[in-house]
Swiss-Prot record:
Part of the ABC transporter complex CcmAB involved in the biogenesis of c-type cytochromes; once thought to export heme, this seems not to be the case, but its exact role is uncertain. Responsible for energy coupling to the transport system. It is a peripheral membrane protein. The keyword Membrane applies. It comes from Arabidopsis thaliana (Mouse-ear cress). This is ABC transporter I family member 1. The gene is ABCI1.
Amino acid sequence: MSIRRPQIPRLLLQNVSCMRNAQQILRHVNVSLHDGGALVLTGTNGSGKSTFLRMLAGFSKPSAGEILWNGHDITQSGIFQQYKLQLNWISLKDAIKERFTVLDNVQWFELLENKIGKAQPALELMGLGRLVKEKSRMLSMGQRKRLQLARLLAIDRPIWLLDEPSVALDDEGVRLLEYIIAEHRKKGGIVIVATHLPIDIEDAMILRLPPRFPRKMTLIDMLDRADIS
């Protein structure tokens, strides 16, 4: 009888720490994600949610520990070139080209990826089908977020890194976001979300990052502390 070896996690963080401006942001974080897995990062502003995602995207390196993809350290140049092709990133900077139409904004990224034909269906799914010929500068904040999500669907990479993806979305938009995350995971995709807003992701691991920066003192605080006689 053969013994089945445990499957290697697709993504593995081992004792990962991170410094920013000489201050410890993340300390000894351990996370493993297999195909279809999801991780939700929560915490106050300044707790390191975006820093965590930036490390996973390879924009910065951990000060200690390792981030492994398929068992290989992503900071190794040869590995990183393969790893970055697995990533799809959404941040608060939407990278929307104002002079392009809604459709062109998605098709432009399709051309870069050599993936054609998914732009229109993705926009339809995200409720932007009637706006495909509109200039992107005319979109509301919620519609811009939907456009980002449509681009995510059209490019269709296996690992999604989503920084505050539900910001500016109405209730219907949040439900669509939850739906496309669920569908992506059914196909074996991995989703990592940083958020301070409620979002329903079934069986997701929750990692709450503790606050790292003291709250700025307000005028009321100063008056309370002042020794006024």
